Amino acid sequence: MSDLYRFGISLDRELIEAFDRHIKGQGYQSRSEALRDLIRNELLRKTTAEGGLVAGAIVMTYDHHKRELVNRLIDIQHDFHDLIISTQHVHLDHENCLEVIAVKGNAPDIEKLSSALKVLVGVKHLDLSLSSAD
């Protein structure tokens, strides 16, 4: 016997047609797959809002020629060492670097780390992506 649970929902025709167009454009094979992802995303938002355990990545680009920027980035990462699983550093060109920081911990702490990095002069772009850690 499967652990799957089947249920029915009632939706307006316009809403389900719009949903079907959306999920087709996203490449979903079925409504069930799309609904599972929507439910997971909503549960992740709840976990994040409640300060729960999450994992994710901070992806940033920066100008490594900016005075003291690299030292500040390293100092901040050391301040949050308990959240950082690993980092990957990529030289994009002579001036620009890409850094990917894998993180795991309580959502508010990871958001503090992300914010501390984002506001540094020389950081051109930073994006935080979180997922469930359980």
Swiss-Prot record:
GO terms for molecular function: DNA binding; DNA-binding transcription factor activity; nickel cation binding. The keyword Protein biosynthesis does not apply. It comes from the Bacteria. Its cofactor is Ni(2+). Ni(2+) binds at H78, H89, H91, C97. SUPFAM superfamilies: ACT-like, Ribbon-helix-helix. One of its GO terms (biological process) is response to nickel cation. Binds 1 nickel ion per subunit. Keywords: DNA-binding, Metal-binding, Nickel, Transcription, Transcription regulation. Transcriptional regulator. NCBIfam families: PRK00630.1, PRK01002.1, PRK02967.1, PRK04460.1. Belongs to the transcriptional regulatory CopG/NikR family. This is Putative nickel-responsive regulator.
